[in-house]
Regions:
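Short, cysteine-centered beta-strand-loop-beta hairpins and adjacent loop/turn segments enriched
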Residues: 61-63, 88-99
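A solvent-exposed, acidic/Ser-Thr-rich amphipathic alpha-helical stretch
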Residues: 25-29, 33-76
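A short hydrophobic beta-strand element
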Residues: 77-89
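Short, solvent-exposed loop/turn segments at secondary-structure boundaries
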Residues: 42-43, 81, 94-97
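Hydrophobic alpha-helical core bundles mediating ligand binding, dimerization, or RNAP-core interactions
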Residues: 13-16, 20, 32, 51, ...
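Short, surface-exposed coil-to-beta transition loops
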Residues: 66-68, 84, 98-105
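Short beta-strand edge/turn micro-motifs at domain boundaries
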Residues: 80, 100-123
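Short, low-complexity N-terminal intrinsically disordered segments enriched in polar/charged residues
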Residues: 1-34
Length: 123
């Protein structure tokens, strides 16, 4: 597994999770190719702005906080890596889990940048 590409995939994933929690997208932008392709079950879009818009839509309302549990990364070949994530959305007032989501993420790394991001609902 090319360590630099895997490192970039892991850095991107961590930055995206932090951005969902905090609203700070600068570290995400630094890892994106200008023409990054963002694929979700609803649509496919291209560009950094589209990627940030997609991550912004995932941010929980102010009454919730989100915690992530990440699975192991898998190499898919040709600069592609996959990871499954379980997100717990907790009420800030009580700390109780209100709902959870399972997602699978694939990222493609080209020239040290994320060139493609795909989110799927995990099986």
């Amino acid at each position: 597994m090319p360590a630099p590409d895997l490192d970039t995939a892991q850095q991107f994933h961590a930055a995206a999770e932090d951005a969902v929690r905090t609203g700070e997208f600068g570290p995400v932008v630094a890892l994106l190719a200008p023409d990054v392709e963002c694929v979700t079950p609803q649509h496919t879009r291209s560009g950094v702005d589209a990627m940030i818009e997609e991550l912004s839509r995932v941010r929980p309302p102010e009454t919730f906080e989100v915690e992530f549990e990440d699975g192991h990364w898998k190499e898919l070949g040709n600069g592609r890596y996959s990871c499954e994530t379980h997100a717990h959305f907790r009420l800030k007032v009580t700390g109780e889990v209100s709902y959870s989501r399972d997602r699978s993420f694939d990222v493609t790394i080209r020239e040290g940048k994320v060139s493609r991001y795909e989110m799927r609902f995990a099986d």
